[in-house]
Amino acid sequence: MGLPWYRVHTIVLNDPGRLLAVHIMHTALVAGWAGSMALYELAVFDPSDPVLDPMWRQGMFVIPFMTRLGIINSWGGWGITGGTITYPGIWSYEGVAGAHIVFSGLCFLAAIWHWVYWDLEIFTDERTGKPSLDLPKIFGIHLFLAGVACFGFGAFHVTGLYGPGIWVSDPYGLTGKVQYVNPAWGVEGFDPFVPGGIASHHIAAGTLGILAGLFHLSVRPPQRLYKGLRMGNIETVLSSSIAAVFFAAFVVAGTMWYGSATTPIELFGPTRYQWDQGYFQQEIYRRVSTGLAKNQSLSEAWSKIPEKLAFYDYIGNNPAKGGLFRAGSMDNGDGIAVGWLGHPIFRDKEGRELFVRRMPTFFETFPVVLVDGAGIVRADVPFRRAESKYSVEQVGVTVEFYGGELNGVSYNDPATVKKYARRAQLGEIFELDRATLKSDGVFRSSPRGWFTFGHASFALLFFFGHIWHGARTLFRDVFAGIDPDLDAQVEFGAFQKLGDPTTRRQVV
């Protein structure tokens, strides 16, 4: 009888050798994808402008993950922070990609070997002579090894004791670099934006995993617990493994979308909440105010704003602006950023400074409204000019730029003023090259958005998978109609009363 496509995994249900083979093949596929994807991204990645055309604007997905773990140089002679590199070393982007591909090939061969030589003595129960796995013991081994890896990452890789450290930056994503991180053992270690928490939590979790692994290797589960949780059933392993995966997927979806020390904005782009809360705008105004307090002119104060900080304060870098089903990188949407034009300051004919209301995240269009410092509407771009009271022409609005390429330039032509007012809705104004990539002008999401969507979606699917397989293994007797603990064959003649074990016939 042929199996339907959704039942094919039953062939490894009672076959430990081939169960191992398919898992090794799965590892080969994952490692092979990672290495191949890294090489593809390196082939299309342009490292020439890390400020206005960073990896997240170009839609890079695996390069940011390598970078946050300490890989910053390429055999192509460039570094992720700019400049040329003479000796990138073996653990460059290409070196890591190649290692994954070699590892994938070895796993591929190992999977084939274990598929062919499936009937190994190690998988045979000495008492019964049938294929069998000591699942509680295997659980202990896996827990111990995972604990060692977790502890090693936190104690050696992150701290720099034996490793490069991790990517660490300031709260505004301006000074990021790979550096050693000391564990944070105090309450500050629970702050998701404190890098020291990464080291301390991995050390603590790894220690717990090692101890728990040793416990499960040395202590057998009680019979009642073993039977109650179906510890001898491979589908129990599947169910609990799926639970671990969906839980991890939900966690990383949250740390990616809301931001954390593990997802620096220099590598994955800003979060939508930084736009919603005017996070970068407030920092820019704070710096300008500090400059003015030091007797700098408005032009000097704005000219000292880093272009990188101004670029974060642009709605096109908001991951929630791009539709989930708009394929392509951010550069394919609004174009490649070329330069900051400067900060526009609008004034009416009475000399009041006016502020353009910024577009909220989930609006595609938004009325152009200019308010004064008290929040009173002073000018707008009306829908119906016949009924307008605050049009740019009537109010006599002018615009002057401070900092950037248009520093010191002013305009009083209403058409030009309205053009820059519309663009000021989107945050700081940048010159964007749409010709190079034939960009269509429609916003795209960043890798932060794609990662979150993918992991949240799969976490939901895996959650239902956990419920499904957990129910199947816990209630196997109900679904199959067979009590797994029934040790006597229920047949006519075995008992005086059919099915009643208390009336078993005595053999004379």
From Swiss-Prot:
> Which SUPFAM superfamilies does the record cross-reference, listed alphabetically?
Photosystem II antenna protein-like (SSF161077)
What is its membrane topology?
Answer: Multi-pass membrane protein
- The record's principal subcellular location, in a coarse class, is plastid
Q: Which GO terms describe its molecular function?
A: chlorophyll binding; electron transporter, transferring electrons within the cyclic electron transport pathway of photosynthesis activity
Stored Gene3D superfamilies: Photosystem II CP47 reaction center protein
Which Pfam families does the record match to this protein? PSII
Listed A to Z, the keywords are: Chlorophyll, Chloroplast, Chromophore, Membrane, Photosynthesis, Photosystem II, Plastid, Thylakoid, Transmembrane, Transmembrane helix
Q: Which GO terms describe its cellular component?
A: chloroplast thylakoid membrane; photosystem II
Can you cite a GO biological process for this protein? photosynthetic electron transport in photosystem II
Oligomeric and partner information: PSII is composed of 1 copy each of membrane proteins PsbA, PsbB, PsbC, PsbD, PsbE, PsbF, PsbH, PsbI, PsbJ, PsbK, PsbL, PsbM, PsbT, PsbX, PsbY, PsbZ, Psb30/Ycf12, at least 3 peripheral proteins of the oxygen-evolving complex and a large number of cofactors. It forms dimeric complexes.
Q: Which family does it belong to?
A: Belongs to the PsbB/PsbC family. PsbB subfamily.
Q: What is this protein called?
A: Photosystem II CP47 reaction center protein
Q: From which source organism is this entry? A: Trachelium caeruleum (Blue throatwort)
Q: What is the lineage of its organism?
A: Eukaryota, Viridiplantae, Streptophyta, Embryophyta, Tracheophyta
Gene name, please?
Answer: psbB
